[in-house]
Every structure is written in C-alpha cells, then in structure tokens.
C-alpha cells in the first residue's frame, strides 16, 4: 500500500495531466480513474470506462456553480442541501463521456456546450489476420492489467470472479489462476461465483462444464437465490440507467453480490469480465434492428461508448 503523502503527490500530478488538456498526457494515466481539474473558469474532467463521472451546472447569484459527482442522486441531494432543488431535473445532468477530456467554461448564462477532446483512440487494422497473434495480444493485455491490480491489493485477500462459464469470465478466471501460481501464491484464495436462480439457469450448467473440463471444479461456488432476489427497481436505482440489457445484467449481478455479501460479510474483491465478443466485433445484429454490419464495423468503440458523442442518438445523460 502507498504512503498517504506519496498517494497525494501522485493524485496531484495525475490531476495535472487532466488539467493540461493534452490528450497524450491523459492517455498515460494507468488504471481506472475519474478526475476533475479547475483552473480559473475552466474545468476539465476525464474518466476511464470503469468509473462514472456526472456533472450539473446550477445558477447562483454570484455565477454558475458546477457540481461533480459519481451519481445523479448525489447531485440532487447536494442541490437540496444548498436550497437549489428547484433547478434540478435528472435530464439536466451530464455524464462525462469515457475516453475524452471534457472542458467546461463557467462563464454564465447561457452555458456553452462542453468541448470534447479524445484521449483514447485505438487504431484499426494494427494486427495481422493470425488469430493466435490477436489472442496473445488480447489476453496479454488482460494479464498485464490483472497483474498490476494484484500488486496493489492484500496478497492474502480472497478473490472472487463473477463467473458464467463464458469466454469473458473464463478468461479472467484462468488468467488470475495462472498469475497466482506464477507468483507462488495459493489458488485456494480464488473462487468462481456463479448465480443460480430458483435452482435453474444456463450459467450454472455452463460454469460447471467449463471447470470440469479443466479439472478446476474445486474453484466453483454456485450461489442459489430465489426469484424474489431479482429486483429490477433496485438495479435501476444502482446503475441510474434504463437500457434493457444493462438493467438485466445489473439485476443478476446485484443479486449475486448481495448473496455473496450475506455468505461472506468480509469479502472485498470481486472481478468481472465482459465485452470480449463485442471487442472482436461479434454482435447479435439480428436481435437489434438499430445495428447493421456497417454500423458495427465503422464504430470502433461501439460496445464501450455507444454511438459516440458526435452521434444524434448519443445520450448526454446516460452514456
């Protein structure tokens, strides 16, 4: 663990990268982050895909007031405390889009649109058509990220993977398993948690088959919950979003996390993996009338960013 002074110095320097507005400097920030930098009337914000960052501009007699928080309800509570609740509406909040530096000028009414500068811009067609080369690069990046994470956490803490037996969670589980053994640590600290609702579910069967084939069934722990544990309203409240697939995923994930917390009150670290199919441009376009082969291929970051900040369908509030 880092000493407090070193952590603060690092945070100040990292915020300075965002404050520079230089996308190349922001791109060098490692790990997940959500950062805000203010210089005079100019506020710059940036986040990675794993951290939400929302903002709202309120009006005070002395000028515009920028409120920044992770959640919409945090913004609402702050405005209520400040006697500004009458200005609030959820649709007036804005999400800082991932992979951009968002620059807001606090110059008063009318508030100008923010300026977006992309700092993460992956290049297309960098790799050959060799699937082994693509797989090595993809899983190698995953291993590098997980290894850095293991370096920062308690080496004795138990680790859980939210496991469906699919390629994404399977890759995360196997890479973690490999990393623990390569560090001379016990794989017994690793568990594959799988949700089973009312004694049924394809994930539980798939998870068992996956691990049986690898002689790793001892890692599996199936978490049984009743149908009543699936609470859509709670899921929407947690993610503050409405898209059906996201709500469906969050509903199951929340039920699984709550059951793990009940069973292991002190468990702290959970890892999840998703989006691998989409990263390799495998989309069920037959199930989504909005998607075409052209829209999938022409939008490099479709899974992570949706239609993108320059598209008419992009949601400023939910992204």
Placement of each model-derived feature along the sequence:
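Low-complexity, flexible helical/coil segments
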Residues: 80-86, 226-231, 254-261, 304-313
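Catalytic metal-binding/acid-base residues of hydrolase active sites
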Residues: 168, 275-277
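Catalytic subdomain that performs nucleotidyl-dependent activation
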Residues: 287-319
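Short glycine-rich phosphate-binding loop at a beta-alpha junction
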Residues: 158-161, 269-273
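Glycine-rich phosphate-binding loop signature in dinucleotide/nucleotide-binding domains
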Residues: 153-156, 260-267
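Cysteine-centered catalytic environments shared across enzyme families
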Residues: 1-223
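ATP-dependent adenylate-handling ligase core
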Residues: 195-260, 264, 277-297
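Short glycine/proline-rich turn/loop motifs
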Residues: 119-129, 234-241, 315-318
């Amino acid at each position: 663990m880092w000493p407090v002074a070193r952590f603060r110095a690092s945070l100040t320097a990292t915020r300075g990268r965002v404050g520079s507005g230089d996308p190349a400097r922001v791109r060098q920030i490692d790990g997940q982050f959500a950062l805000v930098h203010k210089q005079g009337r100019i506020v710059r914000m940036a986040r990675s895909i794993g951290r939400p960052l929302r903002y709202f501009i309120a009006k005070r007699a002395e000028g515009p007031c920028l409120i920044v928080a992770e959640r919409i309800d945090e913004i609402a509570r702050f405005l209520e405390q400040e006697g500004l609740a009458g200005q609030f509406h959820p649709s007036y909040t804005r999400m800082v889009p991932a992979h951009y530096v968002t620059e807001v000028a606090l110059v008063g009414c009318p508030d100008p649109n923010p300026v977006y500068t992309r700092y993460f811009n992956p290049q297309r067609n960098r790799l050959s058509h060799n699937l082994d080369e693509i797989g090595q690069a993809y899983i190698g990046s995953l291993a590098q990220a997980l290894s850095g994470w293991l370096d920062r956490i308690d080496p004795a803490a138990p680790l859980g993977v939210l496991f469906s037996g699919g390629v994404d969670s399977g890759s995360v589980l196997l890479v973690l398993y490999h990393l623990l053994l390569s560090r001379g640590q016990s794989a017994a600290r690793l568990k594959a948690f799988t949700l089973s609702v009312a004694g049924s579910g394809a994930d539980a069967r798939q998870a068992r088959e996956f691990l049986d084939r690898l002689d790793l069934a001892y890692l599996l722990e199936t978490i049984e919950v009743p149908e009543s544990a699936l609470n859509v309203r709670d899921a929407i409240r947690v993610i503050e979003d409405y898209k059906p697939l996201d709500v469906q995923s969050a509903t199951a994930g929340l039920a699984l996390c709550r059951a793990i917390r009940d069973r292991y009150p002190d468990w702290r670290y959970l890892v999840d993996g998703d989006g691998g199919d989409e990263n390799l441009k495998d989309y069920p376009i037959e199930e989504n009338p909005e998607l075409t082969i052209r829209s999938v291929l022409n939008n490099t970051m479709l899974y992570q960013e949706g239609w993108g900040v320059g598209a008419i369908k992009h949601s400023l509030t939910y992204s």
